[in-house]
Regions:
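Loop-to-transmembrane helix entry
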Residues: 4, 30-45, 211-216, 236-259, ...
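Intracellular juxtamembrane helix-capping segments at the cytosolic ends
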Residues: 23, 107-122, 235, 318-336
Length: 430
């Protein structure tokens, strides 16, 4: 079951990346659009579509019933591929607008795919397999894009549609496979809490109930998503690829994937949900602190391109994937929350992609001629500091909140037992 479900989820989202991210391998050198850098504008337009999908998804994913998931997947991937064909057909710069619909169609796919595997005793393993698709797929998408352009000599505008055409039928087949997964058992529900849809009132109540820690996590994730998007979309501008294989990205991301798989794999042996939350956040703090140190001391450390990219990728993805895979599933189970992981993931993504658009627009309008490496290192350094503080505070809050709720549960149990004894004595003959 684990290989079936986890493998299908991993491959499914990897193919979503094949429909969404290959264009990032192209540099579009010398192209401008409406007075702005062409690639920056393509990225902003696609993210705007993605952003709107995330906003709609806060409601849609929270309420999406299981019988409608497959229809949603099929409609999304068909629109995504059609938009890539239009990107190749239409003349630049007007083809940019096709990428808006590409982002719009794929913005909720993570939440939909995750809904197939959440709320199970095996979710930690399944989510780990699913989550690594983000790491490995990003590098593979760029490497395949470079291969198609450099070896097959396909143009920058048609390369995404060609890759998407191969991905679409495979993704439809995997969607069907996920849709055939059995529902969580009663034992799954007992250990991980039943996953239910949330209406607007319930979403607001959930946020109010955990507002301090959710604000900390949402703000920190806002910064992480911005940093990850800039790294993924502009890596070919950040580092000098001359002298390196076009498969460098895939090779580094594969090693990072194996390390994170091993780290997150240890969580399977920890039954206590609060212990898992503390361990995960501690790993995240170590990652963000390392990321900040390496970035702010880039000139002093004199690291090679490969070493720098490996450390950045590992540190960033430990933090990012923690919240995209395991954290909220354990959070729901720990505090017996009635809800689903999709609500949390779509919310943090919506907030994060909003930040990405604002940062790119600020860069384009106020500082168009920048050194991408310096820009990234400065941002990575300060993001690392802020996130280290935010996640450390989150650990303190969660531990204290859990202790408080355990005391309340113990108190209620004692009261109920006392009432039962009193009732028993009251019916005894005098």
């Amino acid at each position: 079951f684990i290989l079936w479900a986890g493998g299908a989820a991993l491959l499914s989202y990897s193919l979503v990346y094949a429909l969404r991210k290959p264009f990032t391998a192209a540099s579009f050198d010398g192209l401008d659009a409406f007075g702005l850098d062409y690639k920056v504008l393509v990225t902003i337009v696609q993210i705007l579509g993605y952003l709107i999908a995330k906003f709609v998804g806060i409601k849609l994913i929270s309420e999406l019933k299981k019988e409608h998931r497959m229809k949603f997947i099929l409609a999304s991937i068909l629109v995504a591929e059609l938009s890539l064909v239009l990107f190749g057909l239409l003349p630049a710069p007007y083809n940019i607008f096709a990428m808006f619909f590409n982002g719009l169609s794929l913005g909720c796919m993570w939440g939909v795919i995750f809904s197939f595997i959440e709320g199970r005793r095996t979710t930690d393993i399944l989510a780990r397999l699913f989550g690594i698709s983000i790491i490995i797929s990003s590098g593979v998408a760029k490497s395949i894009g470079l291969f198609v352009m450099n070896t097959l000599h396909v143009g920058e505008f048609w390369m995404p549609a060609l890759i998407g055409a191969f991905a679409l039928p495979l993704l439809a087949l995997l969607g069907y496979t996920l849709n055939r997964l059995p529902q969580p058992t009663q034992q799954d529900i007992a250990e991980k809490s039943q996953r239910v849809t949330l209406n607007g009132k319930q979403r607001k109540e959930l946020f109010r109930n955990f507002m301090p820690v959710l604000i900390l996590l949402f703000v920190a994730n806002l910064l992480l998503v911005i940093l990850r998007d800039i790294k993924e979309d502009f890596l070919v501008k950040i580092i000098d690829m001359s002298g390196h294989s076009s498969w460098l990205f895939a090779q580094i991301d594969s090693v990072v994937t194996l390390i994170i798989l091993a780290l997150f794999g240890m969580m399977v042996f920890v039954k206590s949900n609060i212990k898992v939350l503390v361990i995960l956040l501690s790993m995240v703090v170590a990652g963000t602190a390392t990321m900040s140190f390496v970035s702010l001391n880039y000139d002093t450390l004199q690291l090679s391109t490969v070493t720098w990219l490996f450390i950045q990728s590992l540190s960033l993805y430990i933090a990012y994937l923690c919240f995209q895979s395991i954290f909220f599933d354990r959070f729901i189970a720990c505090f017996k929350i009635k809800g689903n992981v999709g609500f949390f993931i779509v919310t943090i993504d919506f907030i994060g992609y909003t930040g990405t658009v604002l940062v790119l627009m600020f860069k384009e309008f106020f500082n168009t001629d920048i050194n991408w490496l310096d820009f990234y290192n400065q941002m990575s350094g300060y993001v690392g500091i802020i996130c280290t503080v935010a996640f450390s505070c989150s650990i303190v809050y969660l531990v204290q909140r859990h202790k408080k709720e355990e005391l309340l549960r113990t108190g209620r149990a004692v009261e109920e037992k006392s009432e039962m004894l009193q009732s028993a004595f009251s019916v005894m003959p005098s």
